[in-house]
């Protein structure tokens, strides 16, 4: 009977079987009253059940029980073989780490979402049962695996709410389609800009801005202590030994959430070799140490709401201290700032965007349960701050680069439109943390500054521009993108052109801030596009 309707039913059953583990895995405690024996999957009036014991036999000895053989017909043979490995592959996480995350505000939101799909047999949300199963499974000698999460689920059965699951998949498909349409529109507009620039003829573009400069510089680490905020943080300072022309222009680099000063060390060296003084602070409430503290049980959340205030204030204090300590060496009235992710927000706040409590009220009270924008889990933490004007902008900032910024809600249209300094926004088409469409492409259309640039890295992810540290776990291509060195070379060239133009005041570099120059840099593995304006017709085509 089921074989006759194999088309759509087969596709959806296949999705459920292959993604059962993926629905559980991202939300990585309490002794169960009973252990789950079956997984129930409903499809309209039809209900299927799968004994967990059959999965255990298949995972441990490779034998396909009759109750599992039925489902094997709905999955490609190679995928069915992969299922065995997926079930028993341990996930490297400690019980404390998984518990800390699941009890954090962000973890609880993720549990709520997943609990809509993975429920108890009585059709109750799986929030508490999933949390219990994950933590209990992490205590097992073999470590946390999909199989032992299923075995530790503390009710007789696990029910997959297929209707809700398919709704999420449909929403995701729509977002992907909208994003692809917008990206295609951006790339087309960039190609048209490049063609027009080539027709008009460009200035000499003989310089290879990816290459290091010839300026010698020193590196030192200074620790700043802000007594008023009880906050101490280190800063790596790269100083040119002999600035070629008067005071050295200054660039500040702000790292992302869970990162640290070395993330953009490659860019600091590059800019310093071209005569810039570069300051790279480490933000103590949202750096790698903060994440480690969370996973060790020493912190309660990924980043406290106060980080939305403290990060810009770190940089304002840094500039104050440099002004008093390096008078006569640095031009601190013409400063550029570059930031990635949470650092992208930081750079936009310093450039003129204040926390937008009206937008936070709309988007976060409560958080839209259907949103697929993961960055809102962080942005909405700012809603817990007392609503007031924190005066985060700094008049010394004369240009900003925001890479994969998160700002659509915490700053929103009304605040992003207030920024009047030159601005470059960098997006990755495959960014699943701060998705390109809602976080960069759409916000770019809200900008009113006359000097604005949208840079798009096709196949770029949230992590493509980051340099790994020695302690980093190697990440797969799906996370990093095809070749991070390509993205890093792009950032060297474009950030140098931007800061030479708007911070060092060298107008001859403005020609490099063009679609044509980006086209000349572009590589097949990660195509590069740059544009300065999205025409109304292009916006309409992209659904913006």
List each model region and its residues.
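Short beta-strand element of the alpha/beta-hydrolase
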Residues: 246-256
């Amino acid at each position: 009977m089921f074989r006759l309707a194999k088309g759509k039913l087969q596709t959806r059953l296949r999705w459920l079987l292959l993604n059962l583990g993926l629905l559980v895995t991202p939300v990585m405690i309490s002794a169960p009253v009973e252990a789950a024996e079956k997984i129930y999957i409903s499809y309209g009036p039809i209900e299927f059940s799968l004994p967990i014991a059959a999965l255990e036999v298949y995972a441990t000895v490779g034998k396909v029980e009759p109750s599992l053989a039925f489902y094997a017909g709905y999955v490609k043979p190679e995928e069915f073989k992969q299922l065995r490995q997926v079930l028993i592959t341990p996930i490297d996480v400690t019980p404390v780490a998984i518990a800390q995350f699941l009890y954090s505000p962000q973890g609880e939101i993720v549990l709520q979402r997943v609990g809509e799909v993975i429920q108890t047999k009585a059709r109750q949300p799986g929030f508490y049962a999933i949390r219990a199963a994950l933590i209990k499974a992490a205590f097992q000698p073999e470590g946390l695996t999909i199989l032992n999460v299923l075995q530790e689920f503390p009710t007789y059965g696990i029910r997959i709410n297929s209707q809700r699951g398919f709704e999420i998949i449909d929403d995701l498909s729509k977002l992907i389609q909208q994003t692809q349409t917008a990206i295609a529109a951006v790339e087309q507009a960039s190609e048209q800009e490049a063609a027009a620039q080539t027709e008009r003829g460009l200035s000499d573009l003989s310089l290879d801005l990816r290459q290091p400069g010839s300026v010698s510089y020193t590196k030192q680490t200074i620790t700043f202590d802000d007594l008023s905020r009880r906050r101490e943080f280190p800063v790596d300072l790269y100083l040119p030994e002999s600035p070629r022309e008067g005071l050295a222009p200054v660039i500040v680099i702000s790292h992302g959430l869970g990162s640290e000063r070395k993330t953009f060390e490659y860019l600091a060296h590059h800019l310093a070799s071209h005569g810039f003084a570069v300051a790279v602070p480490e933000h103590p409430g949202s750096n790698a140490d903060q994440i480690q503290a969370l996973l060790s049980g020493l912190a309660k959340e990924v980043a406290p709401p106060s980080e939305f205030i403290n990060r810009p204030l770190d940089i304002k204090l840094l500039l104050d201290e440099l002004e008093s300590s390096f008078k006569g060496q640095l031009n601190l009235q013409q400063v550029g700032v570059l930031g990635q992710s949470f650092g992208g927000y930081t750079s936009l706040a310093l450039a003129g965007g204040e926390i937008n409590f009206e937008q936070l009220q709309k988007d976060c009270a409560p958080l839209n349960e259907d949103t697929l924008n993961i960055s809102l889990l962080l942005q909405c933490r700012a809603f817990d701050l007392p609503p007031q004007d924190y005066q985060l902008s700094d008049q010394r900032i004369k240009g900003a680069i925001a890479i994969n910024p998160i700002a659509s809600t915490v700053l929103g249209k009304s605040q992003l439109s207030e920024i009047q300094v030159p601005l470059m926004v960098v997006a990755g088409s495959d960014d699943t943390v701060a998705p390109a469409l809602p976080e960069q492409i759409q916000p770019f259309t809200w900008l009113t500054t006359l000097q604005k640039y949208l840079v798009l890295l096709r196949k770029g992810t949230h992590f493509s521009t980051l340099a790994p540290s020695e302690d980093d776990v190697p990440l797969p291509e799906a996370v990093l993108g095809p070749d991070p060195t390509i993205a890093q070379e792009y950032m060297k060239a474009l950030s140098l052109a931007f800061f030479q133009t708007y911070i060092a005041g060298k107008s001859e570099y403005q020609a490099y801030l063009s679609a044509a120059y980006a086209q000349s840099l572009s590589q097949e593995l990660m195509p590069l596009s740059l544009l300065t304006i999205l025409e109304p017709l292009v916006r309409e085509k992209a659904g913006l």
